């Protein structure tokens, strides 16, 4: 089962009796009332042994259902421990959503004295059956009330819940096997929990009694559903105007005739297999329509049958392989065997389709191994474009030492840049407890194999030195984290923090200004960095105080890097990777839109590096120069050029605006404002800070794309020829990227198991939103009209201009 699946049982399908265990009573019993008539005639209180029992009853919709059940008498207290299994005559399938159990504790030591009672609903507010240990607070002197709503709820009020309740929930998960067992750590944890429990008891006093009950657990969650609830349909022959609801017990079940026909049609042992069978004209149209489906679409039964029927004639169509493999019944041994034989003879698929075969949909090891064999044809540059997703695909493998893991390591050993990125991508995933063991296995294999590399005849370093250079990257990031913490602790404005940074680099941490040996830059492993230049390093004016560090390189140059601590850069890393990939796809079609795919690398869950690109935000530019054109005139003046700037500069601005308008629309980039739109001196515009993607946006009523009026004015206004050229570039880029929609969708699908916030929250919904942006239902001409309407809608949006003003006010006070 993958991490994205939620498997469950329906309560209406469970035909076993309701079972639970009454465990113990916690807390101190109240002292008897001295004025009680029982105490006046009986022995003194201190000599009387209390004899307690618990009476349990089931109430359905506020009415008693069945007879009450009692536990045995227990007198060996405190604490009173029954640990008795109670089985009711009622079955889980008979329960309603408002079913509840009542528990009343009685004392027989003097008559039939009432200690207290409590009630608990069997289903929570998500309609899931409660399982595991439940701690019920008893209402002293009250018999449990089974009416709905009850007057004796056993649930502790939210404002009174302490740390102990959170721990008890974790213990329930631990006992259900949802938390990994680590013996030595578990022993320490339970000892600490006992101390917390004692502390909570002392803090709360002994004013409350609690009854601990252990509910039955199942392999999967149990979700409430009434018997036949989904199979009620209005009668088509109702003789009155009222809607008559009848239950058809066969609705929703497999039709035996259709199932038999399907088995016969696909049987490999009956009849003659016609390998030369060709589809008719209509069938060919249907097949072509199916082959155009995006990888996210599920095939219907008829579509699967159609592809299976003409599987032999489709072997020369490479696009058909992934669709064919989706229609295979892998549980049928003979069918799976023939599918694998055909796969080996099929026309070799493209790398894009191989990525689809590594998705969680395909579990067959042979299919996944075939996908890896296709990837082996890709060169290092192309492989690096998909490396982030290929590392995530390790989650879907059936073993830690898979063919994919071996392939990634072998390619990394041939290219130090691939090795550096692979090491970082794997290292970041070690924070995921569910897959830490798998990623650590790949990390170890990479380390062991790299250590075995001998020094090259042309002066190449041996494997040990190469690995040590990569390890020193981690040591560097650890020191940068320490610097960030020191700087944040400085009180005062940004200038004081900058002074502290330079003071640290020149004093305590002066070893960072000149490294003993050059280190490969984590962002660009081909570049060797030799130390930090304190005088050229600074801090950004931001809540997290990112460091802007200037590194001297081994060849005498410099490179600037931004280091951020306290921000998860994995989402930014993914978006910038997509920008880089789309830039590559556009250039393959001879369309260079002057994009700026700067480098981003997450080095941990809340830290990472970004390449610094000399630029200024549009907010700064407009504040100081009033317009974008006035700013560009300072760097590229031309009295004879359009608007007083060179034609090359204006063309760069128009193209980059078009490129990012299309990309931010497709990826659903949110939270766009003038502070995260940057402009280079050559006129190239680019976006930064991708905290919201796939349609999420903290601002109300966001436009489809970020295209502010100042950008349109820089092109001469909505009626100018340059604005028309901008729209033309947008439409051309949109249609080019639509052709590669399957590649982009496959890459996002492989990220479905990652911990990237906007994907992890709902992977299926996010990928469907991405698919929707491509408008695959339109042809190229219709998509041009669609995108032009989209541009017009974005330019005329008023609300974002109001939000921009509010954002500027917020920045002023920061």
UniProtKB/Swiss-Prot annotation:
Residues 668-676 are annotated as: Catalytic loop. Belongs to the PI3/PI4-kinase family. One of its GO terms (cellular component) is peroxisome. SMART domains: PI3K_C2, PI3Ka, PI3Kc. InterPro entries: ARM-type_fold, C2_domain_sf, Kinase-like_dom_sf, MHC_I/II-like_Ag-recog, PI3/4_kinase_cat_dom, PI3/4_kinase_cat_sf, PI3/4_kinase_CS, PI3K-type_C2_dom. Keywords: ATP-binding, Kinase, Nucleotide-binding, Transferase. Its EC number is 2.7.1.137. This is Phosphatidylinositol 3-kinase, root isoform. It holds the Pfam family PI3_PI4_kinase. Residues 14-177 form the C2 PI3K-type domain. Residues 687-708 are annotated as: Activation loop. It comes from Glycine max (Soybean). It comes from the Eukaryota. GO terms for molecular function: 1-phosphatidylinositol-3-kinase activity; ATP binding. Residues 539-545 are annotated as: G-loop. Associated with membrane proliferation. It is an enzyme of class 2 (transferase). The keyword Nucleotide-binding applies. Residues 533-799 form the PI3K/PI4K catalytic domain.
